[in-house]
Amino acid sequence: MTISRPEQEVKILVEKDPIKTSFEKWAKPGHFSRNLSKGPNTTTWIWNLHADAHDFDSHTSDLEDISRKVFSAHFGQLAVIFIWISGMYFHGARFSNYEAWLSDPIHIKPSAQVVWPIVGQEILNGDVGGGFQGIQITSGFFQIWRASGITSELQLYTTAIGGLVMAGLMLFAGWFHYHKAAPKLAWFQDVESMLNHHLAGLLGLGSLAWAGHQIHVSMPINELLDAGVDPKEIPLPHEFILNRDLIAELYPSFKSGLIPFFTLNWSAYSDFLTFRGGLNPVTGGLWLSDTAHHHLAIAVLFLIAGHMYRTNWGIGHNMKDILEAHKGPFTGEGHKGLYEIFTTSWHAQLSLNLAMLGSLTIIVAHHMYSMPPYPYLAIDYGTQLSLFTHHMWIGGFCIVGAAAHAAIFMVRDYDSANQYNNLLDRVIRHRDAIISHLNWACIFLGFHSFGLYIHNDTMRALGRPQDMFSDTAIQLQPIFAQWIQNTHVLAPSLTAPQATSATSPVWGEGLITVGGKVAMMPIPLGTADFLVHHIHAFTIHVTVLILLKGVLFSRSSRLIPDKANLGFRFPCDGPGRGGTCQVSAWDHIFLGLFWMYNSLSIAIFHFSWKMQSDVWGNVTPQGISHITGGNFAQSSITINGWLRDFLWAQASQVIQSYGSPLSAYGLIFLGAHFVWAFSLMFLFSGRGYWQELIESIVWAHNKLKVAPAIQPRALSIVQGRAVGVAHYLLGGIATTWAFFLARIISVA
């Protein structure tokens, strides 16, 4: 008797034509809410409309419909991204000096915007070299185009059109997968299939495609550009792809084709897949042959990873099994219950993803300058500073967003009945110990780190430099950081004998200069860095304290035991309970944003000053002339030094920018200060003040018989705070942007 295997049933995971396509709802603002669809009685309606329009949880409790809306919205987001990137490429094609920059990237600055002569605005068109007048850009697009092998504006045009085609495709997909073929809930919850497809498809095949592009297109074109060949003389990408003899002139192993691959003689390919380490001395960027090798290796890893999870074939990992097996001697039930959380709460899933992506973005910020991935990026100081600042802020917002969605998960989706004695439950049960210890750490770090600066300010004021903490008096050397630097210098000889140098000159060996400018060199760390790193530790710990307290106390606290019933955002625990304001999970996000801004301001200020003082500069016969002449070590060890020698001294360019091509930064600097100050109006005054004022103004309108039909109302407490923090951050970020760019474009 033969026992045959039961037939695998094909699951139908798509519902056909679930929702009719109709524009009728577009004409009904607030159609998703019974209250809002009635239309406005008071001005609060428009604020609630904005607050709830994308809060799909508030529209329906049907998880399948919520999932479909989120999925569809993702395609809309991708369409916006494709339109944006298409616009960037179009600007490069239509309004830029890309071809001129490509022929002389050392002396010509990138520009992709020319201002029309209206009311004298053409003053903004500065001379960027090569006879081109325009606004200098610091986005890094020219460098990434060079690394991709783009040699003409026609190629930028065609890529821009491709971006618009992709945007159209994404918009179609968003409509199709909501109205025509909408996935069922089971499809969204099939995590093993999702992992396989995302790992093997997006990351594996994505990296493989990029490695293929780098090898067949980018590297030969960049090899010729580095050798000084005129971009117009370089063969087109398809010629390198189709004509093996052409690329074999540059990389002889191409003559052998795939024979070395199948005979396992992989070292034959080492002419274009290298493991050099360090930076290319011609361009100041990573060796493109190293990055091609890296992407090929990443592709192999992720293609393997994309076959690890169990789907229809009964082999491989099962996420539920992995999570439930994950327990130690002190962790109770471990991760039991976590699978159910991540397959039924998209807020929990989003929180995890934002935390990981935010951390990764900050890691990217630190690698962009220390291991510049694109040619000539390292000597474009404005772009280096912009990319660091941009990635730091994006990472910070993602991490605060992670806390926000963790708290929303706790309030809306957490079911304590299913979470008994697992790690999450145990963390929540000893939250008092966690928060009080973290609070102690914040107090310790705050007093000690700030105290070191106050000591130095006092000693300098009293004329006692010998009693200061500095490299020339009482030294506080960052010995662990110096040990890590030294370890990385030694690493190639120990762990990677084939590599010719360490991952970056930052660690302590070699000076890379391009066109007489420092691309990268060893970054010495001393007492000044020790001091400011402890300020970083302090501000980061306070940010974490606020965000973590918000998450752990989002459902209940001693003060408000039934907090979960009040929701994610609420002003106070009702009338008659004084002292219960600003306790909602939303308020912790609100406060966390300010400390995130504090943390990152100090981090980007540290980076900006340190690089200008100790790294960036010109090579002269007498040695290296740094932009601020190495003043960081002695000036940044006092609060007064930060105020006088960094903020004030380096603000002179933006303050004096009027009448120059940088004058827009002067106006932005001024305007952003106003936006920031405007935020304080919302943050410092209570709702009652404004309601009284409004009622007085309404009285005057009634007198004149011009009273509005929609009753004016003061912003709610939560709305006022939201407007306040938005303007605080917008004003602060734009002020910093203008300050940094006017400075670095002037001196670089």
Swiss-Prot record:
This is Photosystem I P700 chlorophyll a apoprotein A1. It holds the Pfam family PsaA_PsaB. The chain crosses the membrane at residues 70-93, 156-179, 195-219, 291-309, 346-369, 385-411, 433-455, 530-548, 588-609, 662-684, 722-742. One of its GO terms (cellular component) is chloroplast thylakoid membrane. Chlorophyll a' binds at residue 673. [4Fe-4S] cluster binds at residues 572, 581. PsaA and PsaB bind P700, the primary electron donor of photosystem I (PSI), as well as the electron acceptors A0, A1 and FX. PSI is a plastocyanin-ferredoxin oxidoreductase, converting photonic excitation into a charge separation, which transfers an electron from the donor P700 chlorophyll pair to the spectroscopically characterized acceptors A0, A1, FX, FA and FB in turn. Oxidized P700 is reduced on the lumenal side of the thylakoid membrane by plastocyanin. It is found in: Plastid, Chloroplast thylakoid membrane. GO terms for molecular function: 4 iron, 4 sulfur cluster binding; chlorophyll binding; electron transfer activity; magnesium ion binding; oxidoreductase activity.
